Amino acid sequence: MKVVHISSSGKLDGGAELCLVDLIKYEIENGINPYVLLPYKGELQEKLNSMGVETDIIHYLPWRHHRSEPKLKSSAIFLIKIVINLIQEVHIYHFLRKHRVDLVHINTTAVYAGSISAHILNIPLIWHLREFNGQPTSYDFYCKSFSYWLLSNASKCIAVSKVIDNFYSEHLNNSIVIYDSMEEPRHERQSDLFSTDITRIILIGNKKPDKGQMDAIKALSQLRDLPIHLTLIGKDLDEAYVAEMHDYTQKHSLANLLTDNSFDSEAKYKLLESDIALNCSRSESFGRTTVEALMSGCLVIGNNNSCTAELLANGRGLLYEGSEDLSVKIRWAINHPAESKDIAKKGAEFGVGSFQTGNKNIVNLFKSML
């Protein structure tokens, strides 16, 4: 079975790309021959090539735009991208014919590359729904009618959460919910939750406004009477936002309570050293770091929205609304260690029990399309 995966990025610092690598590993282990098309060179291609996966660079462009973009500018860019993408689609068409591909898988909704070629060649198309488009997020499709027509004509769409499935239900009736597979921590925790002198809090996510790191920093300023330390891990993707974070930290004398690190490929192992993990994102279609935190046995406190609320429902974590409420939840957790441990245990059982079969289910879906 030959499967072509189409990635919207050449980077390897996002959940979509990490999940794609995990899926391809599973495919190789189960006798499937994967190929991957990428829009540009980068760490993802290097990783795939090291795994023996054949890749090709075809310079297709996204079909989404920032919603704040002026309408005239957006329309002009859309027309230019249509021309470029049609040219690149010809290259994809020839690639699919040359390799006699059995199935095409588009890994995100950020691109539509390959969808037209798959339709013309009558090749089954599976499309992953990993992102919100339109409200409440900052991005949307250039042309919604065209976008939803292509999505609705896919053989099947895979929603990564119930929240995402509900979001697209108005436009699509060909979707199925399959949670991404997640790997259990390879190491065990070295100490019980809340057993050390300092409560260790961690937030993993690239630093930009929609990831909400300011919620955590503002909450920290209201908890200086407690022995706590906050670690932020993630790339600085928004200079103005990072500057705001640093200014607030200095103004409120929080530097000794805060460690700010860049992206770390081993970040998930730092979860095993943490008591509380935060997800302050404004909107999560899935929440890979949330699941990793649950699996690692942390007490997870998340923003009460989207898939974060889905994952932490039924007593699997704590939910907050606003930085002041976040500080209240953190204080409660520290002052109630026994109850916090019970919540973390329930979350860990859910994490380990619910995210082990995703890749198997996806591959079974692929096979059912042939």
Residue ranges: model-predicted function:
Residues 338-368:
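A charged, aromatic-enriched C-terminal amphipathic alpha-helix characteristic of glycosyltransferases
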Residues 37-43, 204, 229-243:
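Glycosyltransferase donor-sugar binding loop
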Residues 14-22, 199, 208-222, 243:
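A conserved mid-protein helix/loop that constitutes part of the nucleotide-sugar donor-binding site
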Residues 299-302:
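Short hydrophobic beta-strand element within catalytic cores of glycosyltransferases
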Residues 242-263:
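Nucleotide-activated donor-binding/catalytic signature segment of Leloir-type glycosyltransferases, i.e.
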Residues 163, 181:
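Carbohydrate-associated surface elements
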Residues 282:
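Aromatic "clamp/platform" in nucleotide-sugar-dependent glycosyltransferases that forms part
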Residues 314-324, 332-338:
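Conserved acidic donor-binding segment of nucleotide-sugar-dependent glycosyltransferases
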